[in-house]
Each structure stands twice: as C-alpha cells, then as structure tokens.
Regions:
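Hydrophobic alpha-helical transmembrane segments of membrane proteins
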Residues: 1-66, 82-237
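Alpha-helix N-cap/helix-start motif at helix boundaries, enriched for small hydrophobics
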Residues: 78-80
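Short helix-to-coil transition segments within interhelical loops
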Residues: 70-76
Length: 237
C-alpha cells in the first residue's frame, strides 16, 4: 500500500502544484464575495478529490499502468488500498486548505473595515460553522471518491466518468430532495427526518451531527474500498 501511495504522489506531484494554485484562486474569489463564511470550505475537499482521481485514471490509461503495474512487486490489494489512502489524504489536505482560506478571510474581515463592508458575511469567527463545514467537506470528498474510484478501476478513464457522474447525480438527488422537502414543508416531514433537523438546528448537538456525518461518509468510503478490492482481484488484464 505504501509503495502505491508514493507512486500516486509522484505521478501527480507536478499537477498538485497547479491544483493548489487553482484552489487558492477559487477560494480567494469566493472569499472576496462571501467574506467570513465557512460555507466555502466543502468545495475544497470535493474539488481536490475529483481533480486528482481523474488525473490518476487518465495517467493509468495513457501509460497502460493498470497492466504494467502488476509486473512490479505490487499486489492488487496494495494497488487498491494505496490509491484509496492517497485520495483520502488529498481530501484531508483539501479540507485543511479550505479551513486556511476561511481563517484568512475572517482575519481580513476583522482587520479591514472597507473589505467587511463589501462582503456578504462580515461576521467573525464561527467555530461551530467551521466544524460543520469541515465535516461536510470530508463527507462530500469521501462520497464522491467512493463513487469515482470503483468506476475508474473497472472502466478506466474512457467510460468511468460517465458512470461516476451518473451515480453522483443519483446520490445527490436522493440525498438533497429529502432535505429540500423538509426545509420547504417541515410540517409534512417524516418523524425521523424531523428529528434529524431538530438535532441539526441545536447548537449543543450540531458538532455531534457533524462528526456523525463525516464518520458515515468514511464508512461508505471503506465499503467502497472493500467492494472495489473484490472486483479488482477478479479483473482480467
């Protein structure tokens, strides 16, 4: 697993610098408009995972690494676990980058009154919002990564993105629609969803809900890894 982790890092090492500059540019633009808003954080984790996963899959297809890699002292288990571990590290790094941008924007809002008068949210530091946004960033990254990696391992970069995007859209609809319905018509919401909403709106339990969200997404990521590993062992190269 360690060898595969290092191979993936070396493969996208130069691209990571470009992605870093791109994310900082996007984060800076978002901060200029939104100001001290922790809602900018979740985009960092998800965009980092999508960009790196696609770059690795494209590199595998162009260089035929999927076959050549098996002639090296690497097991199929190590290949799958190493890539999943590397993408998890990318998700964590992207989230930390988003946190850094949020903290910088918060300091700028507090230190530059002219800037604070222009942004949408000129408030101060929001610890609960920061924790929730960081958890949401990791959750989105793990869910998207858990969908993309099995499709890329099975179909490569040629057909993988089609299936991955279709699955991501389906999961998004299934996850977002209940939330929208509860927000629009809370009186008609099922008791289970109503209870979750009451927990999410309580500051005492919001941190626990955020932690549960990230843990659930990581569990899904682990299940995806196990399923991908089982399929990759049977794949005929």
């Amino acid at each position: 697993m360690k060898a595969m982790f290092l191979m993936d890092f070396i493969t996208v090492k130069k691209l990571l610098r470009r992605y870093l500059l791109l994310l900082l540019g996007m984060g800076g633009a978002a901060a200029l408009m939104m100001g001290s808003h922790p809602g900018i954080i979740p985009y960092f984790g998800m965009i980092s995972v999508v960009s790196v996963a696609q770059a690795l899959a494209l590199y595998d297809d162009r260089r035929d690494w999927s076959r050549f890699r098996l002639t090296m002292p690497l097991t199929r288990t190590g290949v799958v676990l190493g890539r999943y571990a590397f993408l998890a590290a990318v998700a964590a790094a992207g989230t930390l980058m988003g946190v850094a941008v949020y903290l910088a924007a918060t300091l700028a809002v507090q230190g530059v009154p002219a800037y604070a008068a222009l942004v949408l949210r000129p408030g101060g530091f929001d610890a609960i919002g920061l924790a929730w946004s960081a958890a949401a960033s990791l959750a989105l990254a793990f869910v998207v990564g858990g969908i993309m990696l099995p499709t890329f391992f099975s179909f490569g970069m040629g057909n993988g993105p089609r299936y991955a995007m279709a699955l991501i859209m389906m999961v998004s609809v299934l996850a977002i629609n209940p939330i929208v319905n509860v927000w629009a018509r809370p009186e008609a919401a099922p008791a289970f969803l109503g209870g979750l909403v009451s927990l999410a709106t309580s500051s005492e339990t919001l941190l626990a809900v955020a932690g549960a969200l990230a843990a659930s997404a990581f569990a899904l990521y682990a299940v995806s890894c196990a399923a991908c590993l089982a399929a990759y062992r049977r794949r005929d190269f």
